[in-house]
């Protein structure tokens, strides 16, 4: 089934669909983009008179007054994974007190929807290509954590967002391996090693 395929792509035998649903929910909560279609097959238009209604749904989601499935039932929507693909799987280094096991996805922006950050989890947003974003990080103009810079590096080889989405959709089952970075000091400098790097297993 399609559900089972979505799980296997993430290397999971059970519970994998929840990651895809969480991705869609987070996109809607944090940037106002709802990756869904009407049951009739019609695409969502959040630039028209429906915008204020869906803005209210978004506020209620953020306040935990409803969940994403409530929105689907109320508006006869089907959550869509057609413009989403898994990108990477990161695990927080062991020395951190707060640790996460996080899946990253890429999503292609649907037509007739406007990006608007929520002002809480995301306080600023802009359109920028990966090369320029990495340059700004290197120059100290943008602060980025390691998973962000590495995810951006993986975007650089593609000519367009759709090229990258098409490539990621071809990923076979369990192809995305978890990345648990390891850090150590060498002559006073911090060194980071990734799985597969020489010396990784020694630290």
Regions found by a protein language model. Name each.
Residues 3-4:
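Short, small-residue-biased leader/transition segments that mark boundaries at the very start
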Residues 27:
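Hydrophobic alpha-helical positions that pack around
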Residues 95, 114-116, 202:
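Short helix/loop capping segments that flank catalytic or ligand/cofactor-binding pockets
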Residues 146-203:
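Core RNA-modification/binding signature centered on pseudouridine synthases
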């Amino acid at each position: 089934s399609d559900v089972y395929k979505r799980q296997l792509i993430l290397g999971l035998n059970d519970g994998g669909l929840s990651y895809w649903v969480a991705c869609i929910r987070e996109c809607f909560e944090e940037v106002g983009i709802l990756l869904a279609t009407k049951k009739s097959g019609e695409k969502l238009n959040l630039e028209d008179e429906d915008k204020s209604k869906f803005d209210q749904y978004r506020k209620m989601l953020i306040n935990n007054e409803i969940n994403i499935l409530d929105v689907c039932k109320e508006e006869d929507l089907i959550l869509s994974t057609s413009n989403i693909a898994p990108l990477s799987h990161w695990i927080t280094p062991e020395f951190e007190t707060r640790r996460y096991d996080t899946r990253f996805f890429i999503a292609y922006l649907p037509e007739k929807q406007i990006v608007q950050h929520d002002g809480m989890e995301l306080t600023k947003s802009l359109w920028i290509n990966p090369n320029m974003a990495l340059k700004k990080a290197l120059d100290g103009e943008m602060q980025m954590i390691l998973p962000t810079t590495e995810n951006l590096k993986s975007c650089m080889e593609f000519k367009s967002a759709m090229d990258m989405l098409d490539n990621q959709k071809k990923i076979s089952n369990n192809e995305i391996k978890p990345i648990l970075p390891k850090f150590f000091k060498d002559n006073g400098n911090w060194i980071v090693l990734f799985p597969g790097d020489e010396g990784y297993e020694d630290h």
